[in-house]
Each structure stands twice: as C-alpha cells, then as structure tokens.
A protein has these predicted regions:
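Conserved, carboxylate-rich catalytic/transport cores that coordinate ions
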Residues: 1-419
Length: 419
C-alpha cells in the first residue's frame, strides 16, 4: 500500500480569486541557482502548504494498492489531514541508502525507507519494460561560498533518493489520471507526442555514423535499446542529449493524447500544485467531483498558456545558468582544458568540459590548417585535409579564448585531437 499525500493548495487558492488569477498568470514557479520565484506567495508555499514536521496539514491523498510485482490492485483518492512524523532531506536519505546508517533516523523510518527503496525499483523496472524512456543526464550544480560567491560548477546526477520520490510521484500522477478519465473530470493533461518522422530519421543517421545499429525508434523500448548500446561509453551522455533533442515537447492540453516518453496513456500532473498551475486545476476538479458540483470546462487556451509559461521558465533557467557559467569562466581565460565533442553545426563544434562543468563553442576556423564539411543530412563533420570524421564524445584539447557576454557563450580554440 502506497500513500502519496499532496498539500491541498486548492483549499486556500479559490477559483477566480486575485490569488488564483496571479497563479494562472505565472503558471509555474521558476527555479534559478540560489533562488526561487514562486508561483504562490511564500505564506502558502513555505508555510500553510508546506508539509512541516509535527504539524497538521490539509492534503489530498492518492492511496494505491499493488502486488509484489508492481501491478495495481486498487486505487482511491480523497481529501485528508496528515501530520508529518519526520521531514527528511534527499541528502540524508541518500547517505542511508549508500551506507545503511543514519543516526538521525529512528528504526521505523529506516525500515520504511528500505521497503520503499525496493518497491521503487520494482515500479521503475516495470515502467521501463513498458517503454518509458530512462534518461540519466547531469545538470550543473553551482557551489557558493558563505559570502554568496560562486566557487565551482559541478556535474550533478539524480540520486537514488530522488529517483524513489520520482517513481512514487509518477505512479500517483498516472493513477489520478485514470481516475479522472473514468469520472470524466475536466483537467489539463500532460501530453507528449511521439517524435516527428524527420527527427527520427536524422537521429537514425547519426547513430549509423557512430557505427551503431539503430532500432526502428517506434516505441520507447526502442530508445531504451539504443541507450543500452552505448551504456558506459564516452559517447553515452551525448547520445542521450541527441535522443532528447529528437523528442517532441511535452505540453498541457484539455484533450488526452498520451505520453510517449513515459509510455503512459493516462498522465497528468497532480503532485505539485504549489509550483504548477495545471496541478491546482486537477485538485479543483477532484473537489468539485466530491462535492457533486458541476466542474468548469477547461478551454484549449488554458493548456497553451500553461505550456507557454513553462517554456518561458525553462528559457529563464537555462539562460541564467549560461550567464553564471560565463561569468565564472572569466578566471579561466587562456587556460587549456580536456573536453569532449557534444554537438555540431555549420559553423563549428560544441565542446563540453567536465570540471568546471560548462559547454562552449569552437568555430571551425579555430582549427589551423584544416577545412571542415558539415553534412546536416547525416549530421556528421568531416575534416577534409586529414580525412577524419568527428564523432560525438570524441576527446579534444581546447583553450578558452573568448567570453561572449552578450550571448552568454564560451569560445574555445583548438589545441589537439586527443584520442
């Protein structure tokens, strides 16, 4: 039995209230390094709707029953009041998972975490076998000193503790989605269409050029097979990026079309109404259902607006990261680095450095005594004079020569190919 309890934000944010209108306008919270621009006031996001230890909180609970193989045996969702016994951090739980010890946790908490860890793995394996695509890409982690000065940029991967919560949230979202379908509730769905044919063909050509055999790329299982081919290779993270870029964008809509990346027919966002407006609408639809109130129909424009706000937030987050990376690398001008090729375009090569974790651009003109040909049909670069094909993940030595502050871009010059 798995219970996922989510703060009942809809109790405090009433439909058409000034607070609701502002939340709809923002659409989402924006997470930047070192700060957050919340969708809702902090009196809600950090207090009344924050699940604090030893305090009663209004929640909606998704109660799910499974067998030992992760098959669903029953589901119900209902309003609830919970009191948090202990508020754990990802760091604390990860230490416990890695060492088996944590002096902060009592024995009952340790037993619950051990049980949850095993069951989350069962759910994940079942989901992957169904065709959910299992990406594992690093994100930049910015390190600040006590005075707020940026002192490092590192690779950060999703921890096992994070994956545990992710699996439980995915399950709750999907089962609430099935319930909303059965009850014909008006909600915003999280739709993810399959990749466009042209994108698939370009990806297949890229895979062929890497001397790999691409599967048909018709289902998520095909993409997982491709990821398995490059598991543990230097090109693995860059192939994952290429796969991700070949995907269509997930968007919100008032009509359900399914989620390709999760191989889910019924999928919506239920678990984060504090930071996502579509989740808040799902909570409202559930309350209307329990109260036998006619629920307001949701127009297509509402889904478009939510998708637009999400896209704007992601652009803001990405450009802020690039700005911080560019400013941080000022101290490294003229320094040589070992890098990997992470991508190409007609003008040059994108290179990625592991530490500090940054990406930059090396124009073809920065490689002396060489001419390059970029074939956008086959997505490969050929050095004509040396007759070498450049590959994703290939090592190269570079020097940081310029910081383009207007475009937040790092420019590198070539030193040597490093095979």
């Amino acid at each position: 039995r798995l219970l996922v309890s989510i703060a009942d934000v809809s109790h405090y944010v009433r439909a058409s209230s000034p607070l609701d209108k502002e939340a709809q306008r923002r659409g989402t919270s924006v997470y930047l390094p070192g700060r957050c621009i919340p969708m809702l006031p902090e009196a809600l996001s950090n207090e009344l709707c924050s699940l604090k230890a030893a305090q009663d909180r209004l929640t909606l609970t998704a109660e799910m029953l499974f067998d030992s193989k992760g098959n669903s045996l029953g589901f119900k969702v209902y309003p609830s009041v919970i009191k948090v016994r202990a508020r754990l951090t990802y760091e604390q739980v990860e230490i416990f998972f890695q060492t088996g010890q944590n002096p902060v946790f009592d024995p009952a908490t340790c037993d619950l975490l051990t049980l949850s860890r095993g069951f989350a793995q069962v759910l994940r394996e079942k989901r992957n076998k169904r065709g959910a695509i299992d990406f594992s890409l690093p994100e930049p982690r910015f390190e600040w000193d006590k005075n707020g000065v940026l002192i490092g940029i590192h690779q950060s991967f999703q921890s096992e503790a994070m994956k545990l919560i992710e699996q439980f949230m995915l399950e709750a979202n999907e089962q609430v989605g099935l319930f909303c379908t059965e009850q014909k509730l008006p909600v915003l769905w999280r739709n993810h269409p399959p990749p466009l044919p042209a994108k698939k063909e370009a990806l297949k050509q890229l895979i062929w050029n890497l001397n790999l055999k691409p599967p048909p790329l018709e289902t998520g299982m095909d993409y997982n097979l491709l990821l398995a081919q490059v598991q543990g290779q230097e090109m693995q993270p860059f192939i994952q990026i290429a796969l991700l870029r070949s995907m269509s964008l997930a968007k919100y809509g008032n009509r359900r079309t399914g989620h390709f990346g999760l191989a889910a027919e019924y999928y919506l966002h239920f678990t984060s109404p504090i930071r996502r407006y579509p989740d808040l609408l799902v909570h409202r639809a559930l309350h209307d259902h329990w109260a036998n109130r006619p629920a307001a129909k949701l127009g297509a424009q509402l889904g478009d607006d939510a998708s637009d706000r999400e896209a704007a937030a992601k652009i803001c987050e990405r450009e802020t990261n690039r700005l911080l990376q560019c400013n941080f690398m000022t101290a490294y001008l003229g320094q040589a680095f070992k890098a990997h090729i992470s991508g190409f375009n007609r003008a040059g090569i994108y290179v990625e450095i592991a530490e500090p974790y940054v990406e930059g651009f090396m124009p073809f003109s920065a490689v002396p005594n060489e001419r390059f040909f970029f074939d956008d049909q086959s997505n490969q670069v050929i050095a004509k004079r040396s007759n070498r094909k450049l590959r994703l993940g290939e090592k190269v030595q570079v020097i940081l020569t310029k910081l383009d502050q207007e475009r937040n871009e790092l420019n590198f010059s070539w030193v040597a190919w490093d095979r």
